[in-house]
Amino acid sequence: MNLPLLPTTLVGSYPQPDWLVDKKVLLGRGPPRVRMREVWRVPESELQSAQDDAVRLAVDDMVRAGIDIPTDGEMRRESYFNQFATALDGLDVDAPGEVLSRLGNKTYVPRVVGPIRRTRPVLVRDVEFLRAQTDRPIKVTVPGAFTMTKLAKDEFYGDVGRLIDAYADAVNAELKDLKRVGADVVQLDEPYLQANPDEAREHGVRAIDRALDGIEGPTALHLCFGYAYVVKDKPEGYSFLPELEASSVDQVSIEAAEPDLDLAVLAGLPSKTVIVGALDLSSHEVETAEIVAGRIRAALAHVPPERVIVAPDCGMKYLPRDVAFGKLCALVEGARLVRTEIGGDA
């Protein structure tokens, strides 16, 4: 990929248009783990075409803002999780089970009732469509095996390690197809590594490496505390982060704008590119470019610029679109300021 120093990207999601989703439904619940079809305002017969239009708008916003590595904004998803996680064989999503979320709330999740298998591509058309919208490098996200295991009720395997391995194999098959059709960067979303650090230390690196086995080109992993809309009070540090140095993933995406994070922890990832969260998504206030630049400079005290990518803290799904666009413009300009300061091309 031909990218400038301190390139910019999104973690994944961007606000969906009001004509596509019912924001009262979307904002009235947490991210769904099973299907939430009632969120869509468009009839099923017209939904794919409407989602295509939403992707066009999202990519146009990202390109106009100057984002170097756009996504499709996850316009087709009810959550980062459920589009892929409910498309696998071996699951009952119509009679879901219950587990406790990382916030301690009961949440409905797929029941594992047979062998987990990916029998068909899930996101291939999404990537093909995104690839046709821009000549810039593109990124696509898939929920990781560890997180999918924590958001499922196992009634088949009886062993968490075997369940993780089955999910990882399904993710691996999907990622290979996504790379084949043009995804430049593939990202695993693994928020539950942070939420379950003891179990993550036992299974996390294996889950990542198995999912990424044989994947060529840049790979990323997003590790977060949860959407700012859902999680109001974020901890001051990651319970699982330096452990990722032992994994095969190339890029590690962290929150660094909203939480009061000591960025010295980044020194524990000497072989990784760090996707530094530089936009606070808990506020609708649009940062100035200088505020963003200050957050980037703080990261550069611990990571060389050649190993830094700049992004929002997390997905932007729950923001108003005008706010999200303004924040992306500030992100790009803030990266440009720092790039100029350190002698990179503006």
Predicted regions mapped to residue ranges:
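Domain-level signal for soluble alpha/beta catalytic cores
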Residues: M1-A346
